[in-house]
Structures are given as C-alpha cells and as structure tokens.
Design a protein with these regions (language model features):
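N-terminal pre-domain/capping segments
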Residues: 1-122, 151, 211-214, 319, ...
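Histidine-acidic metal/acid-base catalytic patches
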Residues: 1-7, 14-28, 118, 124, ...
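Active-site acidic/histidine proton-transfer and metal-coordination neighborhood
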Residues: 83, 97-216, 226, 320
Length: 444
C-alpha cells in the first residue's frame, strides 16, 4: 500500500518548498501529492479581482488567467521532491468553492483541469484527480455536462499514449458535496451506483477511442463523512474502481481537512466525546474490498493551525497515524504472509482474531502468562506456556493479542524468541456486535 502525503497547507504557491519537503521526508513519508490547490487556491474564486491584484503585487502567477503557466509554478515543488527522493505519482486539479453560483466559474475549472492533467503527465504522475463541473448546472444536466467534460480529455490522453505507449495514466473522478444554503449535502458522485454508471460509460468510450480504460475513482473519506454515508456499502459497490483514497477528518458538517482522530464532539448529556468520523466503517469498508492502492493523507487545516516551530513534530505524529491506518487496512495481508500463526493472549482480543480470521488462518495455539490457564481450551485453541514459542516451525508469525504490546514484545525478545512478532488489535473488528468477555484474567 502506497502512502502519499498531501502537502496542501504547508506553503503558499509552492514558494520555497525545500524546508517543508525536508520536514515531510524526515517524518518518514516517501511520497507527496502534487496538489495544485497550492498553486491556485479556492480563495482565488471568492474574490477574483482582489486575488488577481494581490498576485500581481507579490509577483505570483494568477493561474485562472494564465493556466498554461502552471508548470512554472510547480517546478520548485517538483525539484524539491526530487532532491529528497520523494515520489510524486499523483496530482489533483484546483477546485471551485462549493458556494459559488456564477456558471462562468466552470470555464475557469475546464481550463485549469486541462492544464493540470498536462502538468501531471509532464511531472511523471500516474493519475490526476479531476473534480466534476457543478457551478450553476441544473441537477438534471449534471451527468450530460460532465460526461462531455471528461470525454474532452481524450485528445490530451491520446497524444500522451502515442508518445508513451507503455505508460499508464488515469483521470480520477471524486465524490462531492453540494452547498444548499450554507449546509453541505450529498453532491455529484456521492451515490456509488451513479459513480459506477459514469465510470462504465466513460471507460466504454475510452476503450473505443484510446484502446484502454482511463477513468478511475478517488474516494474522499471526508466527503463520505459529511454526507453521512456508510463506507461499508459504498466500497462494495465501487470495488475495483477505487484507485485512490483521501484519508482525512472533519466535524461532519464542514469540508475541512484535519488529521484523522482529531475531530470529536460531545453530544448533549454525553459523558465523553466520540469521533466525528465513523472510523470503524472506514477501516472495515476498505478491508472488505482488500483495498491496497494509494492512501492520501490530507490535513491542510491541521497544518495551517499549528505553529511552524512545532510542525516537524506534527508531521512525525501524522506519519504514525498514517502507519496505523496502513497497518489496520493490511492486517489480513500481514497474517496471510506467514505459513503458520501463533497467538499470545487468551482474552477478548484472541477471541476477536478467531472470529475475524480464525477459520481462514487457524493458529497453531495461543499462549498466556497466566499459568492457571495453561492446558485450557479457548475459542478452539489450546492455551500454552510462552516457553512453547521457543520451538516453532519456520515462517511462523506470533501475533500479540493483548494491549500490553510493548511489555510482551520485550518479554519475548528477552526469551530469545526467533519468530517474527506482530501486533493484532480488536479496536476495529470485521465482525459486528459482540459482547466483551470479563474475568478471564482471574485465577480459577
């Protein structure tokens, strides 16, 4: 699974990106998104005249007027990424704010989208996210207008494939929100069935014209949350059409981009806050389709609110959060890579492992530090002494099913256990409702 950091929010107009890219690289990220919102931010379209004058005063290129100069704008960013061996495999075109109503905005978006796709191709990207047109378009005409819009990329794509027949490039559609009097509701392509219909029609046509399918889908988790949708259902419909996932957080009502797990609310009468995003649905939904494509960590609003002096520490923590998601999403792949599996722990987490993966990847046994339980059977497994881990078959993975991960790992390493040690967590189980067992730690 490829982890990509979205640098939007780190710098203005891609100016002096070296220090910021250095921090991103030092945090452990190896891939960056060419987010063209940095070159042409949404605020440009809210106050066009003022933004145009400000850009002129600062010597910046005002891309809505000169979209073909986008390559000049992004060059410092691309040079910095190359300097730090940061891969840039994907891009996203500029977006128009959802509250705009002047249909002339669509002309700007068309020109900027074409320029963005060309820029992404020249930068060596494999795909570019191109949001649909929406400003002032009646609901009944949205599909007709946008199918025509996406087909208009065929000449650019044909030219690219003629020059680079062995390379791949895709245009990714993305689920959107819609502004209704200041409230965000479900927008274009938020319905998974509708998205699949669009993709089938577009790819059928691209197959005829280009000899290959060139359209895919980028699933934005933040938009799913705002629309109040269940990712379990969406992913099953979209399936293999999903070529990228934007991992971000928000409060469920505003289209912000926050670091995952940082948005939480306490409802009336609640004793503790709960996450504003249904992370169980997110993780389970992507696991269900064995998603293994690019994950884009988008946290532009978190980046903007943190002082620059502690940004390196923020980026390091962001990498930890991103790694957690990759671990959760690829849990089954981790289990499957071993010929044999053994568990450490004989409680709720062990039971969770057996409910989710026990039938497909039956462990040899489990073990526990509680001597009084040795020889007991739990969830179809015999509970053994940790000492038995010293004599395991080759290619065995030991999965710690206990929240005291660090202590148990240190215990096993001090014993001289040679097998690989992995972690398991039941925080986001595949199996639905389950009652936790109690009293398993007691001597009986």
């Amino acid at each position: 699974m490829e982890l990509i950091f979205d640098t939007y929010g780190l710098f203005k107009h891609f100016k002096q990106p070296n220090g910021n890219i250095s921090d991103v690289n030092a945090a452990g990220f190896t891939g960056a998104l060419l987010d063209l919102r940095s070159a042409c931010p949404p605020r440009y379209f809210m106050h066009m005249t003022r933004s145009r004058n400000e850009a002129a005063a600062e010597g910046d290129i005002f891309l809505p007027d000169e979209p073909d100069r986008i390559g000049e704008t992004v060059k410092p960013f691309l040079d910095a990424c190359r300097g730090f061996d940061m891969q840039v495999k994907g891009a996203i075109a500029p977006v128009i704010p959802l509250d705009r109503s002047n249909p002339a905005m669509n002309d700007y978006q068309r020109a900027l989208s074409f320029a963005s796709v060309r820029c992404a191709m020249e930068a060596g990207c494999e795909w570019c996210i191109v949001p649909p047109l929406f400003v002032g378009i009646p609901l009944e005409e949205e599909r007709i207008v946008n199918i025509k819009f996406y087909k208009s990329f065929f000449p650019i794509l044909k030219e690219f494939f003629e020059k680079h027949p062995d390379e791949e490039f895709k245009i990714l559609l993305q689920n959107q929100c819609r502004d209704r009097g200041g409230h965000l509701v479900r927008g274009i392509l938020s319905d998974a069935d509708e998205a699949v219909e669009w993709l089938k029609e577009l790819n059928e046509e691209s197959g005829k014209v280009l000899g290959r399918e060139v359209f895919g889908f980028c699933l934005n988790i933040g938009h799913v949350n705002i629309c109040g949708q269940d990712l379990d259902e969406i992913t099953l419909v979209l399936g293999d059409y999903i070529d990228a996932v934007v991992l971000t957080d928000n409060n469920g009502s505003e289209d912000s981009e926050m670091l995952p797990f940082t948005c939480a609310s306490r409802g009336a009468g609640a004793v503790a806050a709960s996450a504003d995003t249904d992370w169980l649905s997110v993780i389970r939904g992507l696991r269900n389709i064995h998603y293994d494509g690019p994950v884009i960590l988008a946290m532009s609003d978190t980046l903007r609110t943190f002082p620059v002096f502690i940004r390196p520490q923020l980026l390091s923590f962001a990498k930890t959060v991103a790694d957690f998601f990759v671990w959760q999403l690829t849990l089954e792949q981790t289990i499957a890579k071993y010929s044999h599996v053994v568990l450490f722990g004989a409680g709720n987490m062990c039971r969770s492992f057996m409910m989710d993966y026990g039938e497909k990847y039956k462990p040899l046994f489990t073990c526990d530090n509680n001597q009084s339980r040795w020889g007991e059977e739990f969830c179809g497994l015999r509970i053994e002494s940790p000492q038995k881990l010293m004599d395991l078959p080759d290619d065995t993975g030991i999965f710690i099913c206990n929240e005291y991960y660090t202590e148990i790992r240190e215990q096993l390493e001090s014993m001289g256990v040679k097998s690989s040690i992995e972690y398991f967590s039941d925080r986001y189980p595949n199996t639905l409702a389950r009652k936790r067992l109690k009293g398993l730690w007691k001597n009986v």
